[in-house]
Amino acid sequence: RDVERSRGLGDVYKRQFVFSNLKKVIKSKTKGTERKELMELFTVINDYNNFSRVLRLKKYYNLTPEQIKNNLLYPFSSISEKTLDRMCRAESSGEVFSVMQETHTGKLIEQIGYVYASDISPRVKYKLARKNMYFSNNPSVVMISYMFVAETELMNIITLIEGTRYKLDSKKIQSLLIV
């Protein structure tokens, strides 16, 4: 069990390393609206990754609030530590959702359709990337957004292939696609 915990923390350390280096690169290589848009994009993505992680760790792993907090990336979140703490201490998934929806970032949950809670993070990422791809004036923001959209479309192709392979109903397959 300690091996599982340390493996999970290794994942957290890797994600912290990636996000801290990403933040350094953005701050050193960009300025103005480009910096603001890139930081906002990655911060919102991390906020929803933290949200999904809280839901998953509560539901499937029954971890304590302290263990859940150790698996989150606080420094790269626009959600306050106090709010993340409330999410970790929530008794049910519904309570986690309501705490998230109280935040500025959490308002996107109402705008996207999702079947499973794990769908929320990729759907938000796709929605933001599509918006940035069309409306940003900064080439780096458009490029990273395009990469996120391409990644999502590849996931959709895989979902279609697997759904067909396992003979799922077309309505079920359609509900799993991120559009």
Where are these regions (language model features)?
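Single conserved hydrophobic/aromatic residue that forms the stacking wall/gate
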Residues: 2-13
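Short, flexible domain-boundary/linker segments around small modular repeats
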Residues: 15-38, 125-144
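Extended, well-ordered protein cores
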Residues: 20, 44-47
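Long, low-complexity, acidic Ser/Pro- and Gly-enriched intrinsically disordered regions
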Residues: 21, 25, 53-56, 70-71
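Solenoid-like repeat scaffolds
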Residues: 40-44, 75-77
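Extracellular/lumenal glycan-associated surfaces
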Residues: 47-62, 155-167
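C-terminal structured domains
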Residues: 76-179
